[in-house]
Amino acid sequence: MDSSWFEKISKEHEVVGLIAGNGPLPVLFAREAKARGMKVVAVAHEGETLPELEEMAWVVQWVRVGELRKLIETFTKRDVKRTLLLGGIDKKRALKELCLDDWALRLIQRLQQRGDDTLLGALAEELGSHGICVLSSQELLRPWLAPEGLITGPAPTEQQEADVRLGIEALQAMGGLDIGQTVVLKEGVILAVEAIEGTDQAIGRAGLLGGPGAVVVKGSKPNQDMRFDVPVVGSKTITTMAQVEARLLALEAGRTLLLNPPEVIGLAQEKGVILVGWKARGGDGKD
């Protein structure tokens, strides 16, 4: 994580909010913030957020997905003016256990489409109306964003490079449809497209269909709000690829997060997975 980000925010605000989803990111952030003398007021999601967050945050309020009023009041009661969104929410669980309060229902009624990006953008606007600014997680996590070019492993073959190009084209074509952020290919054939199951299960499905040698391409959606919705790859993805003998993982440079880069890169080297970073044609990897 970017130490200069903490230095800047801690000078301006002793208390910072955290809307915590699943995975290790919320806990890692809260631990770093606590070590720097900051107080984290966290809204954690039942069944999603790691309980270890309670050891690191100053305040933790547990909510169900959709309890917007409780979320906002947790922040306003502690005079939180800045907050981050870190970690994801399992879409399958959210569909089954969604608990929309009256505030959330009004928010959704104002939306014309139900894509993740739109919902998160609307949430940021709603928080802003209560005097709470959503900070960019991309700035905080910049040191962990994938670089362009070969990250580890041997240079890709011509066929692998062709598969990466096709995967990028597919991702860009699907971006406006709010489909997932991952495409799995082999020798010019698309084996799987990520949907609600998530990246790792899409890779597993592709392995069953196409066998060894697949190429995985992951990136952001064209209009994705990178303040709080950065695509993430961790060690679990590398392990899943190794299990189905997928050979190469191509990540959008500057817009895809390597969760603990030394660990991910080291595991990729151990498992024989090539890592590369790509940039969209004409893109600069920044917002």
Predicted regions, residues:
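Short coil/turn connectors at secondary-structure junctions
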Residues: 11-15, 36-39, 57-58, 78-81, ...
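Feature captures the catalytic cores and cofactor-binding loops of soluble hydro-lyases/lyases
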Residues: 45-80, 97-106, 115, 201-287
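Conserved mixed alpha/beta catalytic, RNA-binding, or beta-rich assembly cores of soluble enzyme
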Residues: 15, 33, 62, 117, ...
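Catalytic domains of riboflavin
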Residues: 1-4, 19, 26-28, 125-135, ...
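Short glycine-rich anion-binding loops that position phosphate/pyrophosphate groups of nucleotides
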Residues: 22, 88-91, 189, 221-222
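General beta-strand structural signal in soluble alpha/beta enzymes
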Residues: 18-20, 42-43, 83-86, 116, ...
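N-terminal glycine-rich phosphate/adenylate-binding segment common to multiple enzyme folds
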Residues: 68-141
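N-terminal basic/disordered segments at the start of proteins
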Residues: 2-45
